[in-house]
Amino acid sequence: MHLLPTHDEVVRVLRDTGALRDGHFVYPNGLHSNEYLQVPLAMRYYQHAKTLSVGLSRLLRANSEIRAMIPELSIVAHATGGLPVAYGVCEALQAKRVYWAERDSENQPMRFRQFIEPLPGEQVVLVDDILRSGRNLVELKALLESYGAIVVALAVVVYQPNPRTANFGDLPLLHVARLEASYYADAASCELCLKSQPIEKVWI
């Protein structure tokens, strides 16, 4: 595998580990799709986790502005999906800090652990395993900015946009692979439903 894995190499890893599957899936937000993607299924395997994280770190290092920040850069994720990627990227970059935000329960806002407080002016890269709707990254970005931290880039293993994907404006968005899936707003508009293809609900 290349130092920076190609799109086809990433897809092969995802399929070989069961992280990427074809079928008829309904996500928690109600969207229907012809693909299931859960990157943690690939991140279970150390070598794959290392390859994907190092590949992402190389994309960050290739950006001259971000490269200049590395000695003081923080890598921040949300629990739990982004944690393996965050640690892998931080190690490969030799960035200064890695930490995360979490929720007490599903409907609670994100927060940092006691005594973990981003510093005003702290330069941060937000990291996650996948960007689909971007809801978690939007909330995490707002949380960091409430402390005065500066988000300088987003870095995700897989970018799989859908009709509800957040707009992050001019903020650099780096990804090892971009995947396109067919999305349908509801059962009435879903071609897979019209074909009576069996449904599998995605619960996480």
Predicted regions mapped to residue ranges:
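Active-site-facing substrate-recognition patch
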Residues: 1-66
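PRPP-dependent phosphoribosyltransferase catalytic core
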Residues: 2-12, 141-204
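Short, well-ordered alpha-helices that flank and scaffold nucleotide-derived cofactor binding pockets
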Residues: 58, 87, 91, 142, ...
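Glycine-rich helix-loop-beta junction characteristic of Rossmann-like nucleotide cofactor-binding loops
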Residues: 60-69, 115-119
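Short glycine-rich phosphate-binding loop at a beta-alpha junction
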Residues: 66-79
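Conserved acidic residues
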Residues: 73, 122, 152
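Short, glycine/charge-rich flexible loops or terminal/linker lids adjacent to PRPP-binding catalytic cores
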Residues: 80-125, 132-135
